[in-house]
Amino acid sequence: MIRKAFVMQVNADAHEEYQRRHNPIWPELEAVLKSHGAHHYAIYLDQERNLLFATVEIESEERWNAVASTDVCQRWWKHMRDVMPANPDNSPISAELKEVFYLQ
């Protein structure tokens, strides 16, 4: 398994809405994530800084990257665009984090 972590932002006035939209996520999005090898996906909110910290374990970079081209992912990004900063293609603006420590 490959462990990934990344950070995104959420609009200051959208914390509750962001959480509401994720609980639960669309069943078809959950199915796509799982079928593309995503496991143990979690997102945490830093309310003071409007930051989202996400972790996920993936089976391969190729399968993880393929999620972005699915119809359901494209619809999800469009659905979330009003609650978080996004790129021109509607994907959330994010930065991948480098792992510096792991205790198993």
Curated annotation (Swiss-Prot):
GO molecular function, one term: L-rhamnose mutarotase activity
Active site: H22 (proton donor)
Residues the record lists as binding substrate: Y18, Y41, W76, W77
Subcellular location(s) per record: Cytoplasm
Pathway in which the depicted protein is active: Carbohydrate metabolism; L-rhamnose metabolism
GO terms classed as biological process: rhamnose catabolic process
Aminoacyl-tRNA synthetase found in the keyword field: no
Catalyzed reaction equations: alpha-L-rhamnose = beta-L-rhamnose
Record note on quaternary structure: Homodimer.
Name of the protein in question: L-rhamnose mutarotase
Protein source organism: Salmonella dublin (strain CT_02021853)
